[in-house]
Amino acid sequence: MNGKEFFARQRHIETPSGTIGYVEQGRGPVALFVHGVLLNGYLWRHQLAQLGDSGRCIAVDLLAHGNTEISATQDVSVTANAHMLAQFLDAMEIDQVDLVGNDSGGGICQIFAALYPKRLRSLALTNCDAHDNWPPEAFKPFVAMVAAGGLAGTLSSMLADKSVYRSALAPAYERPEDVVDDTIETYLRPLVRSEQHTRNMERFVNAFDCRHTVHIEEQLKRVQAPTLIAWGTDDIYFDLKWSLWLANAIPGTRKRVEFASARIFFPEERPQEFNAELRAHWAASSNA
């Protein structure tokens, strides 16, 4: 599905943190997919399309992202986003989920797992922030640019000339040249819908701090939910060592799998391989 079709299917639900945008497909056990910085639930379009026969797949837009609407004073930190996920599940009357996270969304999933372990049926983490690697060294220039007030101009440049996006985010993609204009529009256009939407994204990035993940580390080390660690091996932001760190830190880890030459956004670029791992993980978790 393209971006227009994705947003046409989007629904919204009220939570104490704001009006949360989400898209869902399928029936059965709920899988909740959590994207990372700058993106939105569209990252998971291939998972929704291909895994809907395995369960009810829901891709949510985080606070300060996509079509989620919040107040100008709403906390948008990663811990606040973890609490929002719990509020979202409450509003949807969902008890437990198979949680899947990528990039900063994977860090948010770790915080959620630590704070709300009983709401996990299973956990799957792809290349993501962990421990004290937040923000990653290679992402710090972007964080500094945002802190200096450059986000609005950067987003405008990326939307006016999509090659700017492909160049800037090339390290996050295995094949950046294959990222179509519609995908870039779908990710970035909501962030410039108003000055407040751009400021919300600024606040999200400015709140990056490894204290959020370090703070919940002891609870994370008690998470027993069956956990899959799936990692692209060619990632300048999240080195392979972090997949090993997570596998050792989370006692529920059942499998760690490497995707050779893949980068952060391999769930978007290599969905067949990743979805096969998710299917197997969910099946094994349901029989645990």
For each of these PLM feature ranges, what is it?
Residues 262-271, 275:
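Catalytic histidine-centered segment of alpha/beta-hydrolase-like enzymes
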Residues 6-12, 20-23, 58, 65-100, ...:
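Flexible "cap/lid" subdomain of the alpha/beta-hydrolase fold that forms the substrate-access gate
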Residues 23-67:
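Conserved HGGG/HGGXW glycine-rich cap/lid loop of the alpha/beta-hydrolase fold
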Residues 18, 27-28, 262:
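A generic "binding-loop/recognition-motif" signal
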Residues 29, 39, 46, 107, ...:
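Short alpha-helical
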